[in-house]
Amino acid sequence: MANITLKPLCPLLEEMVQLPNHSNSSLRYIDHVSVLLHGLASLLGLVENGLILFVVGCRMRQTVVTTWVLHLALSDLLAAASLPFFTYFLAVGHSWELGTTFCKLHSSVFFLNMFASGFLLSAISLDRCLQVVRPVWAQNHRTVAAAHRVCLMLWALAVLNTVPYFVFRDTIPRRDGRIMCYYNMLLLNPGSDRDTTCDYRQKALAVSKFLLAFMVPLAIIASSHVAVSLQLHHRGRQRTGRFVRLVAAIVVAFILCWGPYHIFSLLEARAHSVTTLRQLASRGLPFVTSLAFFNSVVNPLLYVLTCPDMLHKLRRSLLTVLESVLVEDSDLSTGPGKRCRRRHRRRASSTTTPASTLLLADRFPQLRPARLIGWMRRGSAELPRRVREQSQEKQGSLSCTLD
């Protein structure tokens, strides 16, 4: 109780500190469901984004497009990694038990993901616009190294914008013994006029993140889309590529997940002077914050659903890992001689039986070997479409989303 009066608090925060813990059975049931959903989302987000990073970073040819997706997945992975701690906060009764330093770090990861996502989506839209509007310039300057440099600059800018949220984040004890991890606008240089300082700082943070992390990226995305559409219409091209559909899906998810959070942040800033908004802001912010967290879970699903090649690579990567584990386990019970003979048989079978011959024999079992060889000598033009599609798939670019 003594700790509550030691720190100067803003009026809104003082009101939140006095709120008792709810004892309604229906609300407790909602809390249990919320903990379950957040736990599943945290597990799903970690697995999804980890797999996307592995596939895009290790299994696909590195292009400018894969560079953007790689950094977006890294941002989402950071947010997903912080979600289990938020789930623990909900599970122990909405009380932060992990200390002040980790409170600052956990909140900073949330805002870092917010800024990084907005900045990276803006860069992707500008990159697409330059490809269409300035193709010669893009061909000369658009490289993977340049894309990585741009991403590093955007990460630095996101970290810079996250600093105020790290500075003003604090742990505040409640009246009922629980601990809040929230803004304390009077934590640093409170000044003589408490109400003015709280109102100014809260509005400055809410408006700045609304503009820099939401409105400005949306304006860049919209203007880039208009420029690309006009240029393609002028050239007589109306085809929508996979990468365009992927970006559109990510932008829609970004708006739906982050839009409500920014609206309630502005309401919270307004609630310092308009007391009637305080209950609405305090009730709605936890829900929209969870919705913003779920954006890091939705994005990997969009990558897989929009790009079939991503799903193919993901399946093949999982199959390769599983096969390696099973082979290692079976090798433990066999001697080195048997392992060598088994590898030799695999090499011999792969060299003596080409894949195309197996496919042809499977497709045309009625052909005898002599007739099959004669039929194959007529030329590759008569090969089954199944064989040609597989060869084209191997030779094609792995970054199918550029089309």
UniProtKB/Swiss-Prot annotation:
The modification Phosphoserine is found at S330, S349. Residues 338-348 have a biased composition (Basic residues). Phosphorylated. GO terms for cellular component: neuron projection; plasma membrane. It comes from the Eukaryota. Disulfide bonds join C103-C198. Pfam families: 7tm_1. Residues 56-71, 126-147, 231-245, 306-403 are cytoplasmic. The chain crosses the membrane at residues 35-55, 72-92, 105-125, 148-168, 210-230, 246-266, 285-305. One of its GO terms (biological process) is calcium-mediated signaling. It is found in: Cell membrane. Gene3D superfamilies: Rhodopsin 7-helix transmembrane proteins. It is a multi-pass membrane protein. Receptor for prostaglandin D2 (PGD2). Coupled to the G(i)-protein. Receptor activation may result in pertussis toxin-sensitive decreases in cAMP levels and Ca(2+) mobilization. PI3K signaling is also implicated in mediating PTGDR2 effects. PGD2 induced receptor internalization. CRTH2 internalization can be regulated by diverse kinases such as, PKC, PKA, GRK2, GPRK5/GRK5 and GRK6. Receptor activation is responsible, at least in part, in immune regulation and allergic/inflammation responses. This is Prostaglandin D2 receptor 2.
